[in-house]
Structures are given as C-alpha cells and as structure tokens.
Amino acid sequence: VTPRGTDAERVEAANTAFYECLERGDFEELSALWMDDEITCVHPGWPVLAGRGEVLRSYALIMAHTDYIQFFLTDVKVSVMGDTALATCTENILSGGPADEESGELGPLVGQLVVATNVFRRTPDGWRLWAHHGSPVLADADEDDEDGDSSS
C-alpha cells in the first residue's frame, strides 16, 4: 500500500515517526526507520557514529538511560530532490532523568533546544533515515549576561 500525499508529506510523516518512536522508547520501530546501508548519526556533543551497529547502539543507550522524553518540533522544513530528502527542524526537548529509588518519582525535567538535520532516502519500503545530525542551540551571550559583565 503506497502512502497518500506528496513526497514532502511522506518525508515529513517519516520524520515525525522517528521522534514519536523515540518518545515511546520503541527500539524495534526506530531500527526499522533507518536504512540498512552505511548510516551516520551525530547526537549533540557526541562524535560521528558510522554504521548501523554504532548508530542503533547509541539509541539503545539513550533509551536505557532516559525515563521520559518528549519532542516538540518547530521550524520543520522538508525538501526533496529525486530519491533524497532533507528535513530540518528545531527539537524542543523535555526530558526526565532516572526515577528516585526511594520515591519512584521521575528525576527533574530538563529542557533543551537542538537543531536537527535528517537525511532520508527513498526505498521500496518508503522513506528511511540515512543520516541524523543534532546540534545544541547555545544561549545567546547577550541573554546570559544582561549587565555586560562577561567576567564570571
């Protein structure tokens, strides 16, 4: 069954599915979204990960150490050229650390902004991820230091 919509709509749906399965912690679905060929991934602050094994291991590690994560995607832009598509977005992330052993309550929630580029390739099974690159959005120095004193 071929999904309805334009290529750009199908790529945007694949991009959304990527983040939704991360939120659910669905490793099998996440794995199915990636191509079988050589893939690459850069998480914020991580080195370049190359190859299906390294990339998928990184997501297994993230899922194992993140009790709660939610992505609010903004500034989503998709462009398609032939069998390759580029999706860029801002990941507005809300995540929670491990639960407190005594209370069982989720650790403090932390917000983070990441800009991401996801590269998709058209396959017989639909659009699949070829590369993901996420970079942290650093706070503007003017916002952090309103009095102009940069010596901390």
Where are these regions (language model features)?
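A beta-strand edge to alpha-helix "cap/lid" segment located at domain peripheries
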Residues: 1-33, 40-152
